[in-house]
Swiss-Prot record:
This is Probable GTP-binding protein EngB. GO terms for molecular function: GTP binding; metal ion binding. One of its GO terms (biological process) is division septum assembly. Mg(2+) binds at S36, T58. It comes from Oleidesulfovibrio alaskensis (strain ATCC BAA-1058 / DSM 17464 / G20) (Desulfovibrio alaskensis). The gene is engB. SUPFAM superfamilies: P-loop containing nucleoside triphosphate hydrolases. NCBIfam families: GTPase_YsxC. The keyword Cell cycle applies. It holds the Pfam family MMR_HSR1.
Length: 218
């Protein structure tokens, strides 16, 4: 049975933050990387998270409760949108940092990376921040359907090198690629002490052959 997402709270300042004891996994990424589309894909319906072709539209922290598991997926404002004023960019960057550092329930960061782009400076900096903060990192390459197999494999190799061996998950909101695997990884991060079933061969998917698992029916 697929979990359900329920929008439980939206805040614009940390003073509005409601204390949740349940684990929280932050969704972070550049503006227009596809966070809202990813949330809607996980939910299995359009409209739960508002999407826009204009970068930088999400200017709040949205808390989605995962039922029946009880943990939260927290959608953070996108970063790096050049058309925002410097003061506004700094305001939201500060809010994101404070949330990640000052919220004990945050147990991991899912960093969304545009599969079409080589590693970007702000993404690399966020990955380094997560390591310094001791937060597990789940890298997700979004918009993978827009890239050919060779480009997907290249992007996975680039990020594997940067992340010290961690291979990003391929994901597409359009085709559903990686949806089931992402749910599995989110649950694993929320409840790290629980035992999980592993693939029959027990081996991770090779980085240079990413299509093997992703092209199977979700």
């Amino acid at each position: 049975m697929q979990p359900k997402l329920v929008l439980e709270n939206t805040i614009y300042t940390l003073e509005q933050l409601v204390s949740f004891n349940a684990p929280q996994i932050a969704l972070a990424g550049r503006s227009n990387v596809g966070k809202s589309s990813l949330v809607n894909t996980l939910a299995g319906r359009k409209g739960l998270a508002r999407t826009s072709s204009t970068p930088g539209k999400t200017r709040s922290i949205n808390f989605y409760k995962v039922d029946p598991d009880g943990y939260y997926v927290v959608d953070l404002p996108g970063y790096g949108y050049a058309r925002c004023s410097k003061a506004e960019r700094e305001k939201w960057a500060k809010l994101i940092r404070r949330y990640l550092v000052e919220t004990p329930a945050v147990c991991a960061i899912a960093i969304l990376l545009d599969c079409r782009l080589s590693p970007q400076k702000l993404d690399v900096e966020l990955a380094a921040f997560a390591r310094q903060a001791g937060l597990p990192l789940l890298p997700v390459l979004t918009k993978a359907d827009k890239c050919k197999q060779q480009e997907r494999a290249l992007r996975q190799r680039e990020w594997r090198t940067i992340l010290g061996g961690e291979v990003p998950l391929l994901f597409s909101s359009k085709t559903g690629m990686g949806k089931d695997k992402l749910w599995q990884e989110l649950h694993r991060l929320a409840f790290p002490d629980m035992a999980f079933d592993t693939p029959s061969d027990g081996a991770p998917e090779p980085a240079d052959e990413p299509e093997a698992a992703s092209e199977r029916a979700e």
